[in-house]
Swiss-Prot record:
Its main location: cytoplasm. It comes from Cryptococcus neoformans var. neoformans serotype D (strain JEC21 / ATCC MYA-565). GO terms for cellular component: cytoplasmic stress granule; P-body. This is ATP-dependent RNA helicase DHH1. Coiled coil: none annotated.
Amino acid sequence: MASSSTLLNDDWKQGLAAPPKDLRPQTEDVTATQGSRFEDFGLRRELLMGIYTAGFERPSPIQEQAIPMALTGRDILARAKNGTGKTASFIIPTLNRINTSLSHIQALILVPTRELALQTSQVCKTLGAHIPNLQVMITTGGTTLRDDILRLQQPVHILVGTPGRILDLGSKGIASLNKCGVFVMDEADKLLSEDFMPVIEQTLALCPQERQVMLFSATFPWTVKEFKDQHMVQPYEINLMDELTLKGVTQYYAYVEESQKVHCLNTLFSKLQINQSIIFCNSTNRVELLAKKVTELGYSCFYSHAKMQQAHRNRVFHDFRNGMTRNLVCSDLLTRGIDIQAVNVVINFDFPRTAESYLHRIGRSGRFGHLGLAISLLTLEDRHNLYRIESELGTEIAPIPAVIDPVLYVAPAMVEEERESPPPKPAAIAAPPAQQQPQQRQRQHPPVPSHQAAQQSPAAAPVQQQQQQQQQQQQQQQQQQPQYQQAYGQGPPQPQALFQQQPNSSPAPAPLPSYSQQAPTQAQGPAPVQSPPPAPSTQPQAPAQTPIQGQIPPTQPRAQQQGQQQPGQPGQAQGQSQPNRRPNTGGFRGNGRGQGHRGRGRGRGGQPGQPGAGAGAGQSQQAQA
């Protein structure tokens, strides 16, 4: 192995295809280090190449403390905040220890969820991309054992999976763990709960006595101490939790009636500068229902929960990670370990029941020291949980203000562009496309020289007068427009000033407001130049292929859906299909006899009427073919 000085003198970094440098500011959660570099740890050259190719620049505090001790083979018990680099803290020393000339399993990494297993295995492959003949295998529940059996017949160096499947493979002799020298548990607090503890102990018994055990998590309950006393040998303890919540995540709450949560969610989408967002619900049924509502508002949206097929869950996670959509509705399935740095907004549509769940939810934003925003929609029944979670986490969740400053959750460069650009006019008073075209052409053409501008000045005066007249007319129309309460009574309750305006929507007293045909555009980056009304969805979406459960393509608003909805595919919004009817040409009368129901019979295709389908008076009517 080359020494640190040799690595520093060589120009091996110049040929690496590193990604563009991330210029976003970072908080002290990842910058408060002692100035160490990855070269100072004595890592192998191939591993260093993978680290810098992946975009790593300097180790974070947890990496700076955990990697050197893990390289010595000592047991590690590390506690650090979400999104501060815990995954690389155990993968880097594990990869440095792997001997690819041996064909047996040398490291076992256990995680609580399938999505986290998929992400962890991908990180292993990315960081070890330059290590020759490195073999990483992932195995989780929801897949057939046959594929795992065939894969384990080949050399496997690192095995990543969920506890149940790992124990199944090990107890049946399919996966040999008797030479596995590294035993890692990510999200150890979850793995050492009552549900997983028996499985973990049985799996650990399959490993040799001379092993290295490493535990990483953001929270450590009392069960972790019991496991440490029984199965770990003088572990090196790391605790970087001066506070539980991330410093870069701003937390707000808003009291909202249950029937108006979707209405408030639409307002947040219209006002916030969302790069990507994750919306959490407390049950799988509410996940699918909310995903359908978000789609009806005109926003592209995927959903994921534990009852979906594993292939569909993997596809949704992969597409959301690659930016195929901006919004993901999910349950607590994705609260642990999921690292998507493009997510800057987390919305608790249902307030979590425990402080642990709340901590992991808001940790999906503000990853690796970046800025993030967490907003919780509360009902009156949730106020007790709010006080309890604040006291347990030692944090303060503030009421949502009238205006949320983008500086709190958006990169400064994007905020400056937003402020330099003129704000867009509301959709209700926006100028027609014909009036916007001259302004667009004026922005597209280069500046006119001064001598030509003098010649064009007489013609420019009428244009300016015309624009002033248009602005005055728009202001008059806005003043004459009926107010919300005058037209619809008291309307839905608006607990905070943020929800007073209804951008790009037509208010209605129903629990779910009916929205205009022009779907609201989710704010992103600098304000766009005025243009004709956009399509119902401006967000990226997956290509039209075989429907995947959990992926809901954007639909038209309700005003455009009458008579056009088709029966939904699995995982898509189930629309009420309308039968194709031709004019009545004197078909046969229905017999009015339903199976167990009495209703009006309807003939189909000119044939004798079928049994009545509705609960009616039992009298047949003129059939419609």
